[in-house]
Amino acid sequence: MTEETTVSKKRWYVLQAFSGFESRVALTLREYIKQQQMEDQFGEVLVPTEEVVENVAGKRRKSERKFFPGYVLVEMEMNDETWHLVKSVPRVMGFIGGTPDKPAPISKREADTILNRLEQNTDKPRHRNEYHPGEEVRVTEGPFADFNGTVEEVDYEKGRLKVSVSMFGRATPVELEFGQVEKIH
């Protein structure tokens, strides 16, 4: 069998895992694959995440957020052996799609969409606190601390906002960093 034939048989499947255990399920599955020497029947095992930046107490903090909490993506050839291997992993509830005995892969388009989203997120992290023009914010740091204002423009590349702060009865446009404001709930 040629390498091309082997690769073309692999499709992406979605596993449902206990929420909060996605990474452990992915790690355990990779270990099982290696122990059973079935690497040729499996491709990637992914927990789709994106890096988000949030401001906590005025400091920027990066963290990871799962796209699909409770799910793990597996690229694999579907047969009795691989099915049983995956089902034997602790905290795996089953496959999504198809029937319990004959799971259905996700479409190539769906897989490509997810993989492209993962690739885009390695370039630049998203901000957990997304701001939108017209939104009310409170300035927490700097000379305008404790003033309220309205978001006029948002620049995610630079992590800055243009906020119209009301001072002395006039709206004054001020450029601030994300860490200098908080949303008014």
Swiss-Prot record:
Gene Ontology biological-process annotations: DNA-templated transcription termination; regulation of DNA-templated transcription elongation; transcription antitermination; transcription elongation-coupled chromatin remodeling
UniProt entry keywords in alphabetical sequence: Transcription, Transcription antitermination, Transcription regulation, Transcription termination
GO cellular component assignments: cytosol
KOW domain mapped to chain residues: 133-161
InterPro entries assigned to the protein according to its UniProt record, in alphabetical order: KOW, NGN, NGN-like_dom, NGN_dom_sf, NusG-like, Rib_uL2_dom2, Transcrpt_antiterm_NusG, Transcrpt_antiterm_NusG_bac_CS
Keyword field contains Transcription: yes
Name of the protein this chain belongs to: Transcription termination/antitermination protein NusG
Native source organism of the sequence: Haemophilus influenzae (strain ATCC 51907 / DSM 11121 / KW20 / Rd)
Source organism phylogeny: Bacteria, Pseudomonadati, Pseudomonadota, Gammaproteobacteria, Pasteurellales
Gene from which this protein is expressed: nusG
